[in-house]
């Protein structure tokens, strides 16, 4: 059976970027259709990414906090985990949110077509679904087809004990020994979950630090904590993976490589993601896709074909949901005739580990590469009353300032709920605030977020909660 639809806008993909674009189009009065290959809206982020991982990380945090309270006189019994119930709760979280999206799509009169969509021309798209083909004739298209985990040719990915992030989030079992390939955000978050549930975690990372994009001083604080839980093998890489009946045997080389192949019950491959640009027949619409699968766009998110836009992971790094959402808004507004551009000063990044590692704006490495003369100011949480009282005094807040203008150009936080504290720094950079603006803003006490104001005071030389190196000498 084949049906045909005519619409002003078709959005290919219903992740955060896609559904945000579609809903914004509808709000601006445009007739809109979403094409989504899966049965629910929300994409990777909501179904097999950001949201389920946070649900499981919440479970992990509660388990770890319960253990830590023994040092303060509150002793719980050894936690008993029911994997089936944890999985059910995770699915409940997902279903609540996907159900909400379905309701909003219906309320906005956005039509959803389920199936795999591919271009057949500059203004046509064909969707292959369970109930047959749907041909969509469109005036404008927004490509939001996302990305998928990288696979390596020497790894037997067909073996069910070789996981990607989606497999890890299914929580089918808790392996006794789990190897995480890749010391990035996804791998470390999943390692955090499975360690709390009882797995022995090894992490192999080819660079000299985990979370390579973040500054070394911030990562150092994080590494000190997780080294007590994980076996970190830095400056090391996997060279061979062999699936045997009794386990997955992994050979490594490098600074921390074991001399012999190691046996694991499961291996999580978390070495990055690749865009889905080559899976759409975009060339039939005249859209240029590069060798890696990315689609190049201008600041209005237009591709080389003016009425076809692209947003989210498929247009390049950083592959983050919040970036895609803003791109979706801009694309929708441009289609509606507004002269809008996607030109953010900053895009925040967060590893939702324990402790969390969060940064926004320029890192020190990036400032050096750009030739910017800068100065940093750091406030250690060991001097924070709230951090000490909350047993998280190993955290740190760092601000990076332009040396001449004193404007904040970057910042990072490592510590409990660091990601929740990052917003002020992002807003300060976006609004062009200098150190004095932040230092003179009265922050509530005792809080963790006052560490941002105190770091600015360190730079200004007005700090009284620490020894002041800028104080006048007597």
How does the language model describe each region?
Residues 10-21, 26-38, 44, 51, ...:
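Flexible, glycine-rich terminal cap/loop adjacent to redox cofactors
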Residues 13-18, 146, 182-187, 272, ...:
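Conserved phosphate-binding and hydrolysis motifs of nucleotide-dependent enzymes
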Residues 158-175, 261-335:
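FAD-site-proximal beta/loop scaffold in flavoenzymes
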Residues 50, 145-200, 204, 232, ...:
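Glycine-rich dinucleotide-binding loop and its adjacent helix/turn
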Residues 2-7, 17, 23-31, 36-174, ...:
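Glycine-rich flavin
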Residues 10-12, 117, 136-146, 180-181, ...:
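Short hydrophobic core segments
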């Amino acid at each position: 059976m084949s049906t045909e639809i005519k619409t002003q806008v078709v959005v290919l993909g219903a992740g955060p970027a896609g559904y945000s674009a579609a809903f914004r189009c509808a709000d601006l009065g445009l007739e809109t259709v979403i094409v989504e290959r899966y049965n629910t809206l929300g994409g990777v982020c909501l179904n097999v990414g950001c949201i389920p991982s946070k649900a499981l990380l919440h479970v992990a945090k509660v388990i770890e906090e319960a253990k830590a309270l023994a040092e303060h006189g509150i002793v719980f019994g050894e936690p008993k985990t029911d994997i089936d119930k944890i999985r059910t709760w995770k699915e409940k979280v997902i279903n609540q949110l996907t159900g909400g999206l379905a309701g909003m799509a219906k309320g906005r009169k956005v039509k959803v077509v389920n199936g795999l969509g591919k271009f057949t021309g500059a203004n046509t798209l064909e969707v292959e679904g369970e109930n047959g083909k749907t041909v969509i004739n469109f005036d404008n298209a927004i490509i939001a087809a996302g990305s998928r985990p990288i696979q390596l040719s020497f790894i037997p990915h067909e073996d069910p004990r070789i996981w990607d992030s989606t497999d890890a989030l299914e929580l089918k079992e808790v392996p006794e020994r789990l190897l995480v390939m890749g010391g990035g955000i996804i791998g470390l978050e999943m390692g955090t979950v499975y360690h709390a549930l009882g797995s022995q975690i090894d992490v192999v990372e080819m660079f000299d630090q985990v979370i390579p994009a973040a500054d070394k001083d911030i990562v150092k604080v994080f590494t000190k904590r997780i080294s007590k839980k994980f076996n970190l093998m830095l400056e090391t890489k996997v060279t061979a993976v062999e699936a045997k009946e009794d386990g997955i045997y992994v050979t490594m080389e490098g600074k921390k490589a074991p001399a012999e192949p190691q046996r694991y019950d499961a291996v999580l491959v978390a070495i990055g993601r690749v865009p889905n640009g080559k899976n759409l027949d975009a060339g039939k619409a005249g859209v240029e896709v590069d060798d890696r699968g990315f689609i190049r766009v201008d600041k209005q998110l237009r591709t080389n074909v003016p009425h076809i836009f692209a947003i989210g992971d498929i247009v390049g790094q950083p592959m983050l949901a919040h970036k895609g959402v803003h791109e979706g808004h801009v694309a929708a507004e441009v289609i509606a005739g507004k002269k809008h551009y996607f030109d953010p000063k900053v895009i925040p990044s967060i590893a939702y580990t324990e402790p969390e590692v969060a940064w926004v704006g320029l890192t020190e490495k990036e400032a050096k590469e750009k030739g910017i003369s800068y100065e940093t100011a750091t406030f250690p949480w060991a001097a924070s009353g709230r951090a000490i009282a909350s047993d998280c005094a190993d955290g740190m807040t760092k601000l990076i300032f332009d040396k001449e203008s004193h404007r904040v150009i970057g910042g990072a936080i490592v510590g409990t709920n660091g990601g929740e504290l990052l917003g002020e720094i992002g807003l300060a950079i976006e609004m062009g605030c200098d150190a004095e603006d932040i230092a003179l803003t009265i922050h509530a006490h005792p809080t963790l977020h006052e560490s941002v104001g105190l770091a600015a005071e360190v730079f200004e030389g007005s700090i009284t909660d620490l020894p002041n190196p800028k104080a006048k000498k007597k």
